[in-house]
Amino acid sequence: MSGSVIPCVGAIVADGEGRLLMIKRGHEPGAGLWSIPGGRIEPGETDAEAVAREMIEETGLTVEVGRLIGRVQRPGLNGAVIDIRDYAATVTGGTLRAGDDAADARWVAPGELAALEITDGLIDALTGWGVLGARQ
């Protein structure tokens, strides 16, 4: 997959108290690190369909997918580029539970993010996009 681009999506979800929905990754890449829910886009899926599917799989929650918040690219294996498009999403149903490759799922207050081991660059991206205030 040298030089290939792997399209992925993420969901930026906040509750009524301003907490972010975070998952603890259960598998590589980034096993044991906290991140927003998301993953690879399956063939034939739109970004919104992929966000909705990943949310159900990883958190048990259904969502309405909103606007594109931001985009990042990360190095993948064998020279691949992981192209991640992160979308706003609003919970419409379900019960929060960790599933699929998520070892844990929880609502986290912005001030508590610093206490978690978070995937590289996530805090900077969320801050740069205006999702978070001053550096947490």
Question: For each of these PLM feature ranges, what is it?
Answer:
Residues L33-W34, R97-Q136:
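Nudix hydrolase/Nudix homology domain
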Residues G39, R53, G66, V108-G111:
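Structural detector for helix-capping/boundary residues
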Residues L61-G70:
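A short coil-to-beta-strand element that immediately follows conserved catalytic motifs
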